[in-house]
Every structure is written in structure tokens, then in C-alpha cells.
């Protein structure tokens, strides 16, 4: 947030099983978004539906206003026949408050109270101590979820990103839930050949009626563990034998700690200023002296604390691995917004001055696909971003992109900004119906996404070069659209044009955009060869 000015065949012929089918008509894949394994469920009804595409003029003139739960299942071990389920730590965790419990990977727990959702009261069987633990850091002992190779609700594209990370050898693998077949799993393996180079193959793991598992019916196993052991010893028709388990990065906790939503200002330490805009400064900092966070400090008068707190209650329920997580707030002026820290900063700066300058088209399209995945989630939740552009996308290690500042723009009370004119308002990213009449919907976000695509392929160039805001508004109303950027494939520019349709309802959905971009180099540009720039 901020102003523009400032900122399966059998035997040896097994084939890889794609989780998403390619549609006959378009060649694009429509799959569910990857979502974190243990995020809690929040009903759509708790989030207002801002997407009234047929808003009247009066409604439109209001300015900038106006999860899948994955329960712990599997084979459970009880303690001494008492019916007490034991859980096992999947990661190390260092206590952040006096009520938290520090623990190490592999440590066993008795869960005393799991009714709190994201933070459970537990007793360590190692130390005997009790305290709160993050529920997404543990799994039932001996369950599939406790296996290092099990990645839960990881999407196909995210599995490929994980496996193709630098340093992973051929045969690196993981198992995840199937996106298309309920109760089935997918085995994803890193492979290599002369034609494709490094790539990933996916195999569907099906369940037998008697509870067993198989990839091919001639090789059946009682457990997934036995299946993994078998294919680790020999490929037996797979592209390669299983060699190394993919690295499963430690996830973000859901919130900073139990009941740590409104935090004291003195619990936050501002360490390094990362950037500033017309309405806020962004700092890297720590909470409670032990947890790295990003802190947005809003300038006085930017928005009312009451309006912000009301919107923040909605924002904190939006949880997806392509959205920057809102951790906590300081609700008294000056308002502080505490979020997860992303090491590479904003996508805009990353593209202009950072590692992004050297990226080729496959990386850039993948980053766009990640943004589309996050926006597809926002779309499903009937929410709107209102200020989608590269400055509001944050980049982490491994070129992971997450959407920030969703929903905040409508709360800004600055007169120049709310009048949708002047240097503070992002005219060049805003759909004409939103800029002229205040009709902000998910379809105006789609328009903005088309502009963001130009930022990606031009490495952060300001849209509509050589034109001021007034000229942009006038020319766009007359039908002008930006030409195809240098070295950008025609097919990608056609997608931008599709996002910039005058009629909002003719613009694509983010679900469509995600599928198109995720399969871009197989369905649309299979003959792509890298050039000097892209």
C-alpha cells in the first residue's frame, strides 16, 4: 500500500499422471490452488462480498470502499490403551512467549486441549512441561502426516517448484494429496533427460478397497511406507528410483502466538527501514525480542483505527500460502501492521534493482502464476484487493511471491487519494470503471493484474511510458491499450489484452489466469527458447 509517486501404463511403460487434466478446448489446466496443510477453516460467509459487478452509479462512487481445513488423520497411537492420542513434532520450535513450549523435531506430545484451533495446549513427554504449541507443527504419531516425505495439500505446481530447487538430485521426491481424486495421493519425482533437462513427473497413487496402495496394479502395498521403500530400491517402471526426500521448509505459524492479535507497541523493535510511501513506512523488525517480522507503520491520518480494525478482522481470516500473513496489529495511532517478513522485499524493487533483472521468461511467468493463485483464492473468498501491482507483491527465498496489502486501499482517507486523482492514486494500474466511477470488483483487480504482467516482462518499467495520469485515463477510455513489450511473446500480450477488456465481465477469472500461466510452457509456448532479455 502506498502512492505510486513514492514507491498410467503398466510394467515398464508407466507414464506420469498429471493431477489436472488439460481441457480439450483451451489447453489450459483448471486446478485447485495450493493451500497450506494445516490452516484452519474460515467460512466464506464471514467475509463480505464486495463483487457486485452491477453496482449503480451511486454505489460505485464510494471511493476505495464501497480455508480449507485439513484435520489430522491417519494411524493413531494411543498411550497405554487410554485413548490418548500422541502427537509428534515435525519441526523445531523456539518458544516466543512464557506460555509457549519449546520443542525439537521428533519430540512426542500429549495434547491437553485442541479446541483453540491454531495453538494447542500440550504436555511434552520428553520434558514433562506443558504449554502452547502451533498445531501445524505436529502430527499424530505413526500417521502419514508424520512422514518426512508427506507434503499434504501441496499443489502440482508448488511441488515442481520445490523439487526443481537448486541442488536437488535426480530422484528427489515427495508425496502429496491428489488435487483431482479424493482419497488418492500423488508421487512427484525430479527427473532428467536430454530433451527436457530437469523436470518433474507425477504419478497417481490409488487406494485399494482393502486399504492398500498402488501405482500399477502389479505392484501393490499395504502402506505408503512400503511403497516408498520399494521404489527407493528400484525404479520398477517409474522414471527413476526414489533417492532423496524433498526439503520441507518450516512453515509459518498461524499468528505469532496464542492470543497475540493486538500487541503492545513496546513488544516491537524496528530494526531497518525497508521502504516508504505516501501513507506508510515498512520496517524489518522483531516481536518479543525473538520473532522476525515486517512492520508497516501508518502515517497519522491515513485511516481511522476503527475502520482499520474492522477490516483487519476480515483480512486475518484470509489464509493462503500466496498471501502475506497478517500476524498482529497495534490499533492505537500510529497504527502498526505486523506481517510475516519476506527476505527479498517488493517485486518492483526486486525486478528493477535486484536479482530479478537477470530472470528469464519461465521464472517471470511462474511468479505471475503465483500471484494469480493468490488472487484466485481472494476471488473464491469474494474479496477484492483494490491495489494490485508489483509494489504490493513481496518476494522471498526461492522466488516465492506473496500478495500484500489486500483490502487496505479502501480505508485510506487522504483527500487527493480518495478523489482518484493526482500523483498519490495508482491510475496506471486501475481499471477505468474503478478510476472514473469507483466501481471496484474482482474484475478491476484482473485489469490490474494485466498491468502487473507488463511490469514483470519489462523488469519494473512504469506502465504507459511517456504518458501522465490524465493522458492514460483519456486514452484508455478511447480504447488505447499498451502494445506488446519488447521480447514478450504475442500469446502473453494477448492475455494482457484479455485482462483489459472494457466490459469487466468479459475479463477472465483468476482461476483461468492461474491455469493458463501454470501450463504456459506446455500448452501455449512449448517451443520457447531463452533470448538475451527474456
Curated annotation (Swiss-Prot):
SUPFAM superfamilies assigned: Protein kinase-like (PK-like), SH2 domain, SH3-domain
Gene Ontology annotations of biological process type: cell differentiation; cell surface receptor protein tyrosine kinase signaling pathway; forebrain development; neuron migration; peptidyl-tyrosine phosphorylation; reelin-mediated signaling pathway; regulation of cell shape; T cell receptor signaling pathway
Sites of Phosphotyrosine modification: 417, 528
Residue positions of the active site: 387
Domain SH2 as annotated: residue spans: 149-246
Domain Protein kinase: 268-521
Family matches, as Gene3D superfamilies: Phosphorylase Kinase, domain 1, SH2 domain, SH3 Domains, Transferase(Phosphotransferase) domain 1
Limits of the SH3 domain: 82-143
EC number: 2.7.10.2
A GO cellular component entry from the record: membrane raft
Activity regulation details: Inhibited by phosphorylation of Tyr-528 by leukocyte common antigen and activated by dephosphorylation of this site.
Catalytic activity: L-tyrosyl-[protein] + ATP = O-phospho-L-tyrosyl-[protein] + ADP + H(+)
Alphabetical list of PANTHER family matching this protein: TYROSINE-PROTEIN KINASE (PTHR24418)
UniProt family annotation: Belongs to the protein kinase superfamily. Tyr protein kinase family. SRC subfamily.
Subunit structure: Associates through its SH3 domain, to the p85 subunit of phosphatidylinositol 3-kinase.
Job of this protein: Tyrosine-protein kinase implicated in the control of cell growth. Plays a role in the regulation of intracellular calcium levels. Required in brain development and mature brain function with important roles in the regulation of axon growth, axon guidance, and neurite extension. Role in CNTN1-mediated signaling.
Protein name: Tyrosine-protein kinase Fyn
Organism: Gallus gallus (Chicken)
Lineage: Eukaryota, Metazoa, Chordata, Craniata, Vertebrata
Amino acid at each position: 500500500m502506498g502512492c505510486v509517486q513514492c514507491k498410467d501404463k503398466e510394467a515398464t511403460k508407466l507414464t506420469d499422471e498429471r493431477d489436472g487434466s488439460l481441457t480439450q478446448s483451451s489447453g489450459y489446466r483448471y486446478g485447485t490452488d495450493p493451500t497450506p496443510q494445516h490452516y484452519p477453516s474460515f467460512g466464506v460467509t464471514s467475509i463480505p462480498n464486495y463483487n457486485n459487478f452491477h453496482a449503480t452509479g451511486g454505489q460505485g462512487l464510494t471511493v476505495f470502499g464501497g480455508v480449507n481445513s485439513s484435520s489430522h488423520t491417519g494411524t493413531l497411537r494411543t498411550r497405554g490403551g487410554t485413548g490418548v492420542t500422541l502427537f509428534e513434532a515435525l519441526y523445531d520450535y523456539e518458544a516466543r512467549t512464557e506460555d509457549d513450549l519449546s520443542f525439537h523435531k521428533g519430540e512426542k506430545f500429549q495434547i491437553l486441549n485442541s479446541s483453540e484451533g491454531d495453538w494447542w495446549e500440550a504436555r511434552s513427554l520428553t520434558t514433562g512441561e506443558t504449554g502452547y504449541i502451533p498445531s501445524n507443527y505436529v502430527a499424530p504419531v505413526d500417521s502419514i502426516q508424520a512422514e518426512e516425505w508427506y507434503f499434504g495439500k501441496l499443489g502440482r505446481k508448488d511441488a515442481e517448484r520445490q523439487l526443481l530447487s537448486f541442488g536437488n538430485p535426480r530422484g528427489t521426491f515427495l508425496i502429496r494429496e491428489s488435487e483431482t481424486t479424493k482419497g488418492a495421493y500423488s508421487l512427484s519425482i525430479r527427473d532428467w533427460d536430454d530433451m527436457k533437462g530437469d523436470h518433474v513427473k507425477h504419478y497417481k497413487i490409488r487406494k485399494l478397497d482393502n486399504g492398500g496402495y498402488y501405482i500399477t496394479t502389479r505392484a501393490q502395498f499395504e502402506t505408503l511406507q512400503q511403497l516408498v521403500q520399494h521404489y527407493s530400491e528400484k525404479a520398477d517402471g517409474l522414471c527413476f528410483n526414489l533417492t532423496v526426500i524433498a526439503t520441507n521448509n518450516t512453515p509459518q505459524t498461524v499468528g505469532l502466538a496464542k492470543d497475540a492479535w493486538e500487541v503492545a507497541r513496546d513488544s516491537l523493535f524496528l530494526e531497518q527501514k525497508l521502504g516508504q510511501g505516501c501513507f506508510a513506512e515498512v520496517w524489518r523488525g522483531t516481536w518479543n525480542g525473538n520473532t522476525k517480522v515486517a512492520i508497516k507503520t501508518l502515517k497519522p491520518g491515513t485511516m481511522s483505527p476503527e475502520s482499520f480494525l474492522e477490516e483487519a478482522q476480515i483480512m486475518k481470516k484470509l489464509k493462503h500460502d500466496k498471501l502475506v500473513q497478517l500476524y498482529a496489529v497495534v490499533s492505537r495511532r500510529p497504527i502498526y501492521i505486523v506481517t510475516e517478513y519476506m527476505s527479498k522485499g517488493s517485486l518492483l524493487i526486486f525486478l528493477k534493482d535486484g536479482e530479478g533483472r537477470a530472470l528469464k521468461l519461465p521464472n517471470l511467468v511462474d511468479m505471475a502464476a503465483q500471484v494469480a493463485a493468490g488472487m484466485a483464492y481472494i476471488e473464491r473468498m469474494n474479496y477484492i484487493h483494490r491495489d494490485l501491482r508489483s509494489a504490493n507483491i513481496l518476494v522471498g527465498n526461492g522466488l516465492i511471491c506473496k500478495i500484500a496489502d489486500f483490502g487496505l486501499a479502501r480505508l485510506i482517507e487522504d483527500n487527493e487519494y480518495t478523489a482518484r486523482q493526482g500523483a498519490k492514486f495508482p491510475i496506471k494500474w486501475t481499471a477505468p470503471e474503478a478510476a472514473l466511477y469507483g466501481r471496484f470488483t474482482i474484475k478491476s483487480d484482473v485489469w490490474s493484474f494485466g498491468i502487473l504482467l507488463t511490469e514483470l516482462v519489462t523488469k519494473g518499467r512504469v506502465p504507459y511510458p511517456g504518458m501522465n495520469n490524465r493522458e492514460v485515463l483519456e486514452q484508455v477510455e478511447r480504447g488505447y491499450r499498451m502494445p506488446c513489450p519488447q521480447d514478450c511473446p504475442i500469446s502473453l500480450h494477448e492475455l494482457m489484452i484479455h485482462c483489459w477488456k472494457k466490459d469487466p465481465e468479459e475479463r477472465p477469472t483468476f482461476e483461468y489466469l492461474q491455469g493458463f500461466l501454470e501450463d504456459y510452457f506446455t500448452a501455449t509456448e512449448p517451443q520457447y527458447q531463452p533470448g538475451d532479455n527474456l
